[in-house]
Regions:
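Short, glycine-rich nucleotide/cofactor-binding loops
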Residues: 10-23
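Anion (oxyanion) recognition and catalysis
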Residues: 33, 76, 115-116
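N-terminal beta-loop-helix "entrance" segment that forms/cooperates
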Residues: 47-61
């Protein structure tokens, strides 16, 4: 197993049904990136909808945060990684080709390894 380095791992399991909660990991992950702390947001369950092209454009803004699409784009532009659960997109009939730029698919082993290697893990 690799040595733990300073990085933060966020797991998000909701989307449009809870826009404020869906925004939180992207706000925190962008702040981490601004602090030179690498961050990854892993979308699981309904969270995978956020990686579907066109979905975020139609989401209601959550809390006092900017629109979720802007939060996602800002995070990716800072070099943040977005992982999307393969079984979750299959269950929701979302094709890999329909995922936003800057996202990549992942499965259980990679998610577990990232959690073990991260300084902190937050689940939303």
């Amino acid at each position: 197993m690799e040595e733990k380095v300073e990085k933060i791992f966020y797991i998000l399991t909701c989307a449009g049904e809870n826009p404020e909660k869906a925004a939180m990991p992207f706000v925190l992950a962008s702040a981490a990136m601004a602090m030179d702390i690498p961050a990854t947001v892993c979308l699981q369950g309904n969270g995978v909808y956020l990686a579907q092209k066109g979905y975020a454009e139609h989401m209601v803004k959550g809390g006092g945060f900017p629109p979720i699409k802007k939060l996602i784009l800002d995070f990716v532009e800072q070099g943040g990684k977005i992982w999307v659960c393969v079984p979750c997109i299959k269950e929701r009939n979302i094709a890999v080709e329909d995922l936003i730029e800057g996202s990549e698919t992942t499965a259980a082993a990679k998610v577990n390894l990232e959690a073990l290697q991260s300084s902190a893990v937050f689940v939303y």
